[in-house]
């Protein structure tokens, strides 16, 4: 895991109490035909999924809870690779609450016991009260975003004294600013358009924004400009196709790459591995 940065220590946000009504987490699979980014499957985020991994999809759009490992598990020094997917995660591990920002390249982190909530692109910044570009490529302690004793108390309540596995819903409530703004539906439209392979220009036109406006909104909501988000989503489309057994040449065409060589370059640059290596893991 990259060292946690110190981000926006001058900002102060109110916190939602951890004791509020828990979210309706469920362990059912997504509806057939649902867009891949709705489910936010861990196979997009973590491509080495252990038998101890459990996902909990939520009726709240754009969020999924997950647990990996068991209390006391240290991972034995093993690591797992996290790929860029445009998402932001709120994480709990070893008594710490962390925010994992949107990534532009793959990184390795230790296994062990993790509990988290993953938010699809554009969801978390409004809930956390922090622009996504300030979290890009970082793993940040929640206390650095929300300074003060309140964050420490919230962490202790999520931890539960170390006796039990903290549910994702408890982490959710401890990581949402009480004055959080509602998520702009325009952001969802941007993601859907780019996920479908539309160009940045066509996407901007479809939501009624100019190129500069879209870029500015994208930095705050997704952590990077629309071209980078489109590139990340395109790589994820290719991974889903390749893992489903689609030949690489056909995968390149269906995912929106110019050719198979273009696909290979993009995957190597963002994931640090070849497409065949990712599929085999």
UniProtKB/Swiss-Prot annotation:
Residue range(s) of DNA binding per entry: 201-222, 248-271
One Gene Ontology MF term: DNA-binding transcription factor activity
Pfam family, one: HTH_18
Domain of life: Bacteria
HTH araC/xylS-type domain residues: 184-281
Entry annotated with the keyword Nucleotidyltransferase: no
InterPro entries cross-referenced by the UniProt entry: AraC_XylS_family_regulators (IPR050204), DUF6597 (IPR046532), HTH_AraC (IPR018060), HTH_AraC-typ_CS (IPR018062)
GO biological process, one term: response to antibiotic
Spans annotated as Disordered: 21-42
Keywords from the UniProt entry: Antibiotic resistance, DNA-binding, Transcription, Transcription regulation
Keyword match Nucleus: no
PANTHER family, A to Z: BLL1074 PROTEIN (PTHR46796:SF15), HTH-TYPE TRANSCRIPTIONAL ACTIVATOR RHAS-RELATED (PTHR46796)
Protein name in UniProt: Uncharacterized HTH-type transcriptional regulator in mcrB 3'region
